[in-house]
Amino acid sequence: MLNCRFGGMQLSVKTDTDAYLIAPQPGLARLTRAVTGRDQTGAETTINVVEERPLTIYLNAQEIVTAMTIGDYPEYLALGFLRNQGMLRDGEDITSVDYDEELEVVVVRTARKTDYEDKMRKKTRTSGCAVGTVFGDMMEGLEGVILPTTALRTSWLYDLSAQINRTPSLYLEAGAIHGTVLCQGNRPLVYMEDVGRHNAVDKIARWMLSEKVDGGDKIMYTTGRLTAEMVIKCALMGIPVLVSRSGFTAWGVEIAQQVGLTLIGRMRGKRFMCLSG
């Protein structure tokens, strides 16, 4: 059980027009910036571009990582990242989570003393943007992981793709951003966006942990590539199905086959490719 304090956290409210528990917030002014330029005809035009700001994550007194993020859910990103990297344990007693907007820092404090110097030396840069770091024992954590077999209907995939594509989002507003959606059946539940696809996954991981949501009957939908990093995080979150409109990497497919994860890519309209599961 987590015991956390959050400051300044504002969640989206479910509306009559969608079924999301948390939905994108494209209307938040601090997430985009108006920039003026010229188009191909030379005409002056103003467009919105996504903000990108650093967020440094501390665990107790130790600096862990600096991530580039849009800054909408800093506490969720920090806790989800630490959880997915194995730095926060199941049932961890988290005494406080403090976010300083001016310093762009989140400090997570636990009752347990922590020291991850050895772990930090084993980190591996991945193909992910913004953070792109996997620690060695995160991959070791996959040993013995076999995901549950779950029913999956093609109609769910078609419904999810259509619903997600028409949801108002920062991607539709400004582009240059990734989206990740936690789904159940044909219903999208939590939709997170960020400049790094793994950031969006980490935010969802934090939500699942706080709400005690089991991943065994869930589907993860992402706009990003199906890389090893994405597959590892999905597997460690206990989610047996990972879907993307984008393509695969060989290592991602190999790990998915190892843990029994259903991996579906190139999801466009009613076309897709399944390489594992």
Where are these predicted regions, by residue range?
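Feature captures the catalytic cores and cofactor-binding loops of soluble hydro-lyases/lyases
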Residues: 197-277
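Flexible, glycine- and charge-enriched loops at secondary-structure boundaries
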Residues: 194
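Intrinsically disordered, low-complexity regions enriched in acidic/Ser/Thr/Pro/Gln residues
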Residues: 4, 8-185, 190-191
